[in-house]
């Protein structure tokens, strides 16, 4: 029996500034090291990128095929999954499916992990007039959760419920600000 066996995982992060803010993959790797585990990672992350953008970005495809990844983490643009179900189905779902299917085609053993994000601190003011459910943090968070869980279920993938943990932490520790001043990106504490 191996006691203290080291775990080594290879993870590709595909997303945008929510991932590269505060060098999140390195933070996770450092956390793994505290347990003598190893996280080898790469990333295809560009500020503001949607799943559609990644589907048309050669670097994303190159990185998907560059390794036998244990996990590929897929994180959508922060607002898109909070839009109406019809809009998500038309503008986000097809590209989430294309990325998921491409990861599985490159290596059937890779587990796709959808990174369920958090709502903006006070909701999405820009899109509130056209879709009122996103006018508040709670409304936006509920829509994000619904969309990411639909991706997970539709594609038989996994989901990292980051936004669910974020909401719980926000409720338990309201004095700790998880957001940068833009009320969208994570502070160091948020990451």
Segments from the language model and where they lie:
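Alpha-helical cap/lid subdomain in secreted, periplasmic
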Residues: 63-188
């Amino acid at each position: 029996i191996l006691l203290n066996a080291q775990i080594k995982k290879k993870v590709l992060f595909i997303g945008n500034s929510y991932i590269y803010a505060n060098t999140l993959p390195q933070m996770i790797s450092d956390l793994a090291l505290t347990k003598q585990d190893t996280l080898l990672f790469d990333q295809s992350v560009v500020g503001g990128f949607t799943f559609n953008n990644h589907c048309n970005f050669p670097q994303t495809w190159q990185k998907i095929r560059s390794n036998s990844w244990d996990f590929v983490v897929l994180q959508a643009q922060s607002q898109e999954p909070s839009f109406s179900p019809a809009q998500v189905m038309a503008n986000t779902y097809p590209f989430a499916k294309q990325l998921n299917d491409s990861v599985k085609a490159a290596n059937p053993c890779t587990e796709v992990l959808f990174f369920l994000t958090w709502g903006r601190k006070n909701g999405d003011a820009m899109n509130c007039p056209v879709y009122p459910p996103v006018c508040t943090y709670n409304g936006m968070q509920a829509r994000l959760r619904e969309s990411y869980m639909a991706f997970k279920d539709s594609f038989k993938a996994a989901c990292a419920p980051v936004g669910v943990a974020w909401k719980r932490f926000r409720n338990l520790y309201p004095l700790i600000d998880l957001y940068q001043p833009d009320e969208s990106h994570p502070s160091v504490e948020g990451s």
